[in-house]
From Swiss-Prot:
Keyword Acetylation among UniProt keywords: yes
SUPFAM superfamilies reported for this sequence: UBC-like
PROSITE patterns the UniProt entry points to: RWD
Keywords, in A-Z order: Acetylation
Protein name: RWD domain-containing protein 4
PANTHER family: RWD DOMAIN-CONTAINING PROTEIN 4
Gene this protein is translated from: RWDD4
Alphabetical list of Pfam families matching this protein: RWD
Composition bias, Basic and acidic residues: 155-166
Residue list for modification N-acetylserine: S2
Keyword Acetylation: yes
Residues covered by the RWD domain: 9-111
Length: 188
């Protein structure tokens, strides 16, 4: 079989195997993503496999550069890719996309044993908090809220409901009053 026929057969098999699986995503007929782990799992990661023109005789391109993997350190990513590359070399010449995804699912805990989540929000807040002491003493002025009297507060509370929203229909026009002002066509 030619490489193109092998790819078509594997593509058909992947579509039937992963039909309805939310973790699997077909980016193009030669590029696939699979999320290993659940959505909220801090040890979840995303693998992208792209086939070359001569795949499966040549190895596919493996990638973990997806935005989903931003919390994973580059050392852990390199470790995962190295282990997947070993599996690629063992399966060279055969359809291996499903095998690689399953291998990653089976070895997820081993792959992520050295994983310490990088929290980008924490690192940004650390940068901000480092810069804040320099600017904080110079701006001690606080913005004052508008002070309302009791009567103003009561009037505002009467207009709004318990959520602070205006009631439904507060700007509706009284139909009878409106029509009496405009008159009918017979009056002209």
């Amino acid at each position: 079989m030619s490489a193109n026929e092998d790819q078509e057969m594997e593509l058909e098999a992947l579509r039937s195997i992963y039909e309805g699986d939310e973790s699997f995503r077909e980016l193009s007929p030669v590029s696939f993503q699979y999320r290993i782990g659940e959505n909220g799992d801090p040890k979840a990661f995303l693998i992208e496999i792209s086939w070359t023109e001569t795949y499966p005789q040549t190895p596919p391109i493996l990638s973990m550069n997806a935005f989903f993997n931003n919390t994973i350190s580059s050392a852990v990513k390199q470790s995962i890719l190295a282990k997947l590359q070993e599996a690629v070399e063992a399966n060279l010449g055969t359809a291996m996309t499903y095998t690689l995804f399953e291998y990653a699912k089976d070895n997820k805990e081993q792959f992520m044993e050295n994983h310490n989540p990088i929290n980008s929000a924490t690192s940004i807040s650390n940068i901000i908090s480092i810069e804040t002491p320099n600017t904080a003493p110079s701006s001690k002025k606080k913005d004052k809220k508008e002070q309302l009297s009791k009567a103003q507060k009561r009037k505002l509370a009467d207009k709004t409901d318990h959520k602070g929203e205006l009631p439904r229909g507060w700007n509706w026009v009284d139909v009878v009053k409106h029509l009496s002002k405009t008159g009918s066509k017979d009056d002209e």
